[in-house]
Curated annotation (Swiss-Prot):
It comes from the Bacteria. The keyword Calcium does not apply. This is Large ribosomal subunit protein uL23. GO terms for cellular component: ribonucleoprotein complex; ribosome. Keywords: Ribonucleoprotein, Ribosomal protein, RNA-binding, rRNA-binding. One of the early assembly proteins it binds 23S rRNA. One of the proteins that surrounds the polypeptide exit tunnel on the outside of the ribosome. Forms the main docking site for trigger factor binding to the ribosome. GO terms for molecular function: rRNA binding; structural constituent of ribosome. NCBIfam families: PRK05738.2-4. One of its GO terms (biological process) is translation. Belongs to the universal ribosomal protein uL23 family. It comes from Aster yellows witches'-broom phytoplasma (strain AYWB). Part of the 50S ribosomal subunit. Contacts protein L29, and trigger factor when it is bound to the ribosome.
Length: 96
C-alpha cells in the first residue's frame, strides 16, 4: 500500500488538464520515473477507489531556463494521463 503512494506524486492542474477532466474524464498525474502503466493503474484504483480504463504515459524532458545571469534546467518527470470509467470522479481540488 505504501508503495502506491510513492508511485503517484502529485496531480497536474493546468487549463488543459481541466478541459480533459470536464470533456473526457481524464486525469493527469506526475508519477515516478520507474513506474509502468500497470503499476500506475493499480495505484490509482487503490488510492482513489475508482475504475481506471486506460493509462497513457509520457516522459517530459528537462527544459533550459535562464533567469538573469543564472542558467539551468528544470527537472524532467514522467506524467500519466488516466481515463476513468463513466460516472467516476476524483476529488483533486477542495471545491469539487
Amino acid at each position: 500500500m505504501n508503495k502506491y503512494y510513492d508511485l503517484v506524486k502529485a496531480p497536474i492542474i493546468t487549463e488543459l488538464t481541466n478541459k480533459l477532466i470536464e470533456r473526457q474524464n481524464k486525469y493527469t498525474f506526475k508519477v515516478a520515473k520507474t513506474a509502468n502503466k500497470v503499476e500506475i493503474k493499480k495505484a490509482l484504483e487503490s488510492i482513489f477507489q475508482v475504475k481506471v480504463l486506460s493509462v497513457n504515459t509520457r516522459n517530459v524532458l528537462p527544459q533550459f531556463k535562464r533567469k538573469g545571469k543564472f542558467e539551468g534546467y528544470t527537472s524532467g518527470y514522467k506524467k500519466a494521463i488516466c481515463k476513468l470509467a463513466p460516472g467516476q470522479k476524483i476529488k483533486i481540488l477542495a471545491n469539487e
